[in-house]
Every structure is written in structure tokens, then in C-alpha cells.
């Protein structure tokens, strides 16, 4: 496939999107990333509310803890890329296996945060969940770039981030909030806890499933990538 137009310019959006969407691995990884962001933005927006409603902690102290835990997210992004590059030298499927595995490992830790009454233990656990759940981004960007030609890479990043943010920001906080409001008459201030418990586990496993499916097609799709 031609990776630039006849005048030397980069391929247009339509061409890049058509190329990406013809690759089954990208279709599944983009859905996985979108659901991943759905969990991230949904849980992230309501986690402060969970602590303020159900734990004895002041706003300022909570903000400090959560700000510090975001550093772990940066570490997770680096480690996700590092592990994928290291393991991917032997088998490119690791670029999807790393996000899938870290996403599944994340789940029991985040369930502990939602269920425990131990405030500071829950806050310390956010460092673990932050690191694990941010390990997905670098591998998915790397494999997306590998599926396209050099001149398509910027646009392919934009397409992936559009899907990620459309699903994540567009629906994550809205769905968590909607479920919380629906069950509020029954559970009161506990409704945010049960909303997270209803939505997050299913969505997390759903995301990981698409990563595993994408991994099945990675090697074949990389063979078709423009050189």
C-alpha cells in the first residue's frame, strides 16, 4: 500500500482510517483501549467521591494522596512500554499481552479499594492500580505505529486517541454517575461504591478480552504493514 500521496504529502484521514480498520488487530485493540479509557475516566472521576463519602479523610489530604499516586501512573506507562519492547522482540503478541495481563491484575486491587474500610491501605493501593492500569498506552501506540507506514503515524495516533477519548470521556463518567443515581434510593451514600462494583469489573474483563483477541492477529497484520 502506498504510504504517501503522489505529491509527497501524508495520506489523508480517510486513507489512514481505511488502512487501520482493515486490520483486525487494530479493530480489537482500539475497542480495548476505548473500554480501558472508559474504566479509567469513569473510576478516576468518582474515586475522590468514594473516599470523601465513605472514608474519614479531608479534601486536601485526599488530593495530596491522589496527586502522588498519579506518579505511579507515569511509572506504569514507562514499564508497559519497556516490558512490551523487551518481550516483543521474541513475539510481537506481547504488545497486547502486556496490556491484557496488567489490566486483569489491576482488577482485584481496585475491588479492594472499593470494598475496604481501611482508608490509608486503600490510598496506598491506588499506587498499584495507577501503575498497572496505565501500562496499556505505550504498547498500543507502538503497535499502532507498526501497523502503518511512516507517513501515517501521526494520523494513526490521532485516530486511536479519538476512539479512546470518545468512549472513555464520553461514556465513562456518565455511565458510572447514571448507575449511581439509579441505585441511590436503595443504597444512599453507598451508591457510588456499588455503581463502581457493577460497572468496573465487567468492563475491565471486556477490555482485556479484546487485547487477547488483538494479539491473535498481530503477527499476520504486521506482515501486511507498509515497509
Range-by-range predicted roles:
Residues 58, 94-97, 180-201:
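A membrane-interface helix-boundary motif in multi-pass transporters
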Residues 107-115, 197-227:
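Multi-pass alpha-helical transporter architecture, strongest
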Residues 4-30, 54:
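Juxtamembrane intracellular "pre-TM" segments in multi-pass secondary transporters
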Residues 77, 147-185:
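A late C-terminal transmembrane helix in Major Facilitator Superfamily
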